[in-house]
Amino acid sequence: MSFKSTASKHQAQTTVSKLFANILPNHTIGNDEDKQEKLSSTQLLSNQLKQSSVPLKKVKKKTNAKIKKINDSNTKFKKFVKYNIIKSREEHTVEEQKYLKKLVKRNASQIKNLSHIDNMQIEEELSDVRASLIDKIGKKENKRLRKRKLTSAKNSKFDDFDNKVKRGFISVPGLTPGLAPIDYNESDSE
């Protein structure tokens, strides 16, 4: 029998040898060396990919975990440096004040989440920090205690839009009384 390619010949031979192996008890399918010689290049490639795909996933997972850990440590270090730079200055810009307030809120929430601390030194340090914060907050001499109420950004956007409409900078689409449709009744729309 003639075959068009070695792959089809190999497939036919393996099918027949598997059939004989199921029927005849002493029949062997063939040597591994013969299989390697008779396999086409695509079959060899697919076999290699099947065998090496599982370890590649594990290796990729490990490398991604290492990269993530390095990135996390880099970001923590950058945040620490930024905090120390801001902390060393006497006067802070508005952005720096916002950043410091955000840090205070985050750290305060983390402290609140700790239910019980076993180490006595840490408890003493926390109580010292709390006391110093209360002292700093409590000393508001020569400062206003009340500030004027600020409108939220959402309300200010609406107010700005309404002011622009009133001044005529923005026109709102709609019907004017003279351009209403002829057969339009207000009672029909309700």
Swiss-Prot record:
Keyword terms of this UniProt record: Nucleus, Transcription, Transcription regulation
Family matches, as InterPro entries: Rrt14
GO cellular component entries: nucleolus
Membrane-spanning residues: none
Keyword Nucleus among record annotations: yes
Intracellular or extracellular location(s): Nucleus, Nucleolus
Source organism superkingdom: Eukaryota
Family indicated by similarity: Belongs to the RRT14 family.
Known function: Involved in ribosome biogenesis, probably through modulation of rDNA transcription.
Name recorded for this polypeptide: Regulator of rDNA transcription 14
Underlying gene: RRT14
